[in-house]
Curated annotation (Swiss-Prot):
Provenance organism: Drosophila melanogaster
Gene Ontology cellular component list: endoplasmic reticulum membrane
Protein's name according to its UniProt entry: Probable cytochrome P450 6w1
Family note: Belongs to the cytochrome P450 family.
Its job: May be involved in the metabolism of insect hormones and in the breakdown of synthetic insecticides.
CDD domains in UniProt: CYP6-like
Keywords on record: Endoplasmic reticulum, Heme, Iron, Membrane, Metal-binding, Microsome, Monooxygenase, Oxidoreductase
GO MF annotation list: heme binding; iron ion binding; monooxygenase activity; oxidoreductase activity, acting on paired donors, with incorporation or reduction of molecular oxygen
EC id: 1.14.-.-
Localization of this protein: Endoplasmic reticulum membrane; Microsome membrane
Recorded topology in the membrane: Peripheral membrane protein
Domain of life: Eukaryota
Any Gene Ontology biological process: insecticide catabolic process
GN (gene name): Cyp6w1
Positions bound to heme: 450
Length: 514
């Protein structure tokens, strides 16, 4: 009897708490999506029907909210805001950035040093200092110094395509991922991963494992995305134990070798060694923060982001060009016009290719790899606080999560006519005056945008030039007609393999051959 009474009391308390919690937006007069008990508005994501970015996209595109500047939602029991209006997005991401300089995502600071200490997850005020110290490796000058190393990997990709043989049906993401694995290993760590040559490359195995989620890893990511306040209690980790061990041992080895030999490569390892020396020269707080895991964490996020984003961009580009072979032939003609039979793809010339830029820009419009942007509201204890004016007089609570769907904005016919059509001509210089570039944000917006944007674009372009100059990609019987997104992936990734048929092209005369 006592147990039943206790259970009844707990049920009543839970009901009252849920009702109070899930009435937040109604009480504040904000239009919202009606939540379900316990799961809030995220039932599709939590039941693995859609990936997280698509859940945010569905919020943005929910019927009845077409003219609303924002949408109130519930991430399980936590109120959150999905911003739809471009001016409000600019306000949050740029003009009033001081209120939104932290990301929502968090991992366990006590048990996940590689996740918690890296630049992507770093919180204010430490993130700004860390970004300032790491950013030199991503400047145009440093990238140009690393470019010869990148070209070597590009030639390896070209050779790998040659070895496939004409008429081979290839799993495109696998090929592109091996290219980006080798490239990142070379320019970031100064090691040869040999993923293009070795089917069992250890580097490639661990890179792929980061995005291959088991049930337990899926739960970790659900907490990181949805309920970051539970990250410490649930002891969630960004990287698995096996991957953490591999990255830590690899980076530690390279750091020691570089210190022993004194070699300079103008790469990420040089930057990390400079941080280590600075910490040693300034004992105190900095020396406590800059330990081995702090250094390894920066290399880990560099490796992860560089591997997946560029590989996905290349994959989706080849998929679209295989479906639109006239566009593919036009790009190949530009490659021939710029380089002919030259062995070397020069840094300056690849930057000057207008149609290549149009193609990559259009891929990133239709497929912005992360798919959404998130920030956490940080209200000051004193002074002016952030409100939703002029749309609403509500003052956002400290710690509230804010989301923006880049996919929804990039596919909004208000900004992009016929948005489902793959059309590189949108980005033709003659059409520039017709574009609203505020509606284009594949690398994020504001001071916390993607630090590796230049490098990511360059490695995608370099890979495409090397693989398309002598090869044509066709659809085949195994090519999927419509992409369904993998519900457990933290980024935009096809649920099924994208398979294309590759043919050797020996020159201009072959361009029309099918």
């Amino acid at each position: 009897m006592l147990l039943l009474l206790l259970l009844g009391s707990l049920t009543i308390v839970f009901y009252i708490w849920q009702r109070r919690t899930l009435s937040f937006w109604e009480r504040h007069g904000v239009k919202y999506i009606r939540p379900f008990p316990v799961v809030g508005c995220t039932r599709e994501f939590l039941t693995a029907k859609v990936p997280f970015f698509e859940q945010i996209q569905k919020f943005h595109e929910a019927p009845g909210f077409e003219n609303e500047p924002f949408v109130g939602v519930y991430m399980t029991h936590r109120p959150a805001l999905v911003i739809r209006d471009l001016e409000l997005i600019k306000t949050v991401m740029i003009k009033k950035f001081q209120y939104f300089n932290n990301r929502v995502l968090q991992t366990d600071p006590h048990n996940d040093a590689l996740g918690y200490k890296n630049l992507f997850f770093a919180r204010s005020p430490g993130w700004r200092e860390l970004r300032t110290k790491i950013s030199p490796v991503f400047t145009s000058g440093k990238i140009k110094q690393m470019y010869p190393l990148m070209v070597k990997i590009g030639k390896n990709l070209q050779d790998s395509a040659e070895r496939l043989g004409s008429g081979t049906e290839v799993q495109v993401k696998d090929l592109c991922s091996r290219f980006t694995t080798d490239l990142i290993a070379t320019i970031a760590f100064g090691v040869e991963a040999n993923a293009l040559q070795d089917a069992k490359s250890e580097f490639f195995y661990h890179n792929r494992a980061i995005f291959s989620l088991t049930l337990s890893r899926g739960i970790d990511f659900a907490i990181i995305f949805m309920i970051p306040a539970l990250a410490s209690l649930a002891r969630v980790k960004l990287f698995s134990r096996e991957t953490t061990k591999f990255i830590r041992s690899s980076v530690n080895y390279v750091l020691k070798e570089r210190e022993r030999t004194g070699e300079k490569r103008n790469d990420l390892i040089d930057i990390l060694l400079a941080l280590k020396r600075e910490a040693a020269a300034n004992p105190g707080k900095m020396s406590k923060e800059v330990d081995l895991d702090y250094l390894v964490a920066q290399a880990a996020v560099f490796q992860t982001a560089g591997f997946e984003t560029s590989a996905s961009t290349m994959t989706m580009t080849l998929y679209e060009l295989a479906k639109n072979e006239a566009l593919q032939d036009r790009l190949r003609q530009e490659i021939v016009d710029f380089f002919g039979d030259e062995d070397h793809i020069s840094y300056e010339r690849i930057q000057e290719m207008p149609y290549l830029s149009q193609v990559v820009n259009e891929t990133l419009r239709k497929y912005p790899i992360v798919g959404y942007i998130e920030r956490e509201c940080s209200q000051p204890a004193e002074g002016e606080r952030f409100t939703l004016e002029p749309f609403h007089n509500m003052e956002l609570p400290h710690g509230m999560s804010i989301y923006m769907s880049t996919v929804a904005v990039h596919r909004d016919p208000q900004y992009w006519p016929d948005p489902e059509k793959y059309d590189p001509e949108r980005f033709n210089s003659s059409n520039r005056d017709n574009l609203n570039m505020d509606a284009y944000m594949p690398f994020g917006v504001g001071p916390r945008n993607c630090i590796g944007m230049r490098l990511g674009l360059l490695q995608s372009k370099l890979g495409l030039v090397h693989i398309l100059r002598n090869h044509r990609f066709h659809t085949c019987d195994k090519t999927i007609k419509k992409i369904e997104w993998a519900p457990t992936s933290p980024v935009m990734a096809s649920k099924r393999d994208i398979i294309l048929r590759v043919e050797k092209v020996s020159g201009k005369k072959d361009f029309g051959q099918k």
